[in-house]
Amino acid sequence: MIAIPAIDLREGACVQLVGGSYAAEKVRVEEPLEALKQWRRHGFRAFHVVDLDAALGKGSNADAIFQLTAYERGLTFSVGGGVRDSDRVETVLSGGAEFVVVGTRAIEDAGWLADIANRFPGRVVVAADVKGREVVTRGWTAGSHRDIREVLAAFEPLPLGGLLVTAVHKEGQLSGVDLPLMREVASTSRHRLYASGGVTTMEDLRALAAAGAYGAVIGMALYTGRLDASAVAREFAG
């Protein structure tokens, strides 16, 4: 399993939110490139970038994203947040990202998801953000009334690059991962699982690896120093 630092962008800065609430910003790094450089010094090579403003339809951090993806050859970026049309998918993938992460429209429009997945096989990652068992959309602000297992079943035939499953109720809480949820996804789906939400300790990472996760996205625990970044990178940087 690989550990993947999160770089969440808001108003041009790198931030961390508690519980998926845009009113609960706990960490802010004014220059996202400095965050990337910090994680590179520890040895990380894969990064998950989210444009929080675009996710809410309130702007874009496209310039900051390009700075990140252009920084160094050989790094792997997954980029998401507000990717709701095919032109944006193409822009992200041609701009240096290995994977594009699609959430809201992928959940709401199966035909569109099938189209982009087949146009870009292995490069589309679907974000399934989960509160309890319900998949939520629109920057975690809207419910879909669909259970995670129902949503997973719809993705099985598609040539996806993976599933990014975020336990929103654990996000930024430093309270541990939702291991039953991640075990269920790993055992139910044939796609690579990228687990997110609540990673706090090395034991959390080892448990996710044992559960079958391909990758773990880590945010708050790295930014606050709760996790030793060097130790994580030594064991899980890939």
Swiss-Prot record:
Disulfide bonds: none annotated. Keywords: Amino-acid biosynthesis, Cytoplasm, Histidine biosynthesis, Isomerase. One of its GO terms (cellular component) is cytoplasm. It comes from Myxococcus xanthus (strain DK1622). The lineage of its organism: Bacteria, Pseudomonadati, Myxococcota, Myxococcia, Myxococcales. This is 1-(5-phosphoribosyl)-5-[(5-phosphoribosylamino)methylideneamino] imidazole-4-carboxamide isomerase. It catalyses: 1-(5-phospho-beta-D-ribosyl)-5-[(5-phospho-beta-D-ribosylamino)methylideneamino]imidazole-4-carboxamide = 5-[(5-phospho-1-deoxy-D-ribulos-1-ylimino)methylamino]-1-(5-phospho-beta-D-ribosyl)imidazole-4-carboxamide. Transmembrane segments: none annotated. One of its GO terms (biological process) is L-tryptophan biosynthetic process.
